[in-house]
Amino acid sequence: MERIDLGKVNRLPAAILENLPESIGNVGCYSVHVEEDCVTVVDQSKVARRGRKPTVMEISTEIIRRRGVKYRVMGYTRMNDAYRGAGVAALVYELVAKQTGPIMSGSSQSGGGRSIWNTLAKRGLLTVLANWKGVYHEVESTEFGEVAAYNFSLYSTAARLCAA
């Protein structure tokens, strides 16, 4: 997994309510909608204007199968600036893992992505493991905002994080 740096400003366009699939659940007042290639989180507390509601975050996803297990790969996560720092991303990842099956990290992660997986490991509601060379290894959260594996360096190898 590689470390990457991303831009700091995100202004996501409002979501058109008719185009969204059925919600899989809520995180506070935010509804989570899962499609084949995207997870969209919409703020339900705001008044809809012209059939649109503010988008809190979007996660690009893809479905892969490894050793007979179907994973949803959580790729690029974009968060609207107005909702940053509220801890919504880790809660959305937990909800998606519980409702749709195991999730997996992408091949590269920004600082924010590493922080999300660290929060998942710290909360302990999901089992977070590192998949490296076909073997699952335990990981632990660190005070540096990223998870660490016991036997190898997680971010300098081709390892992927998995949660279920």
Q: Residue spans of the language-model regions?
A:
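Non-catalytic substrate-recognition and accessory regions of acyl/acetyltransferase enzymes
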Residues: 1-84, 90-164
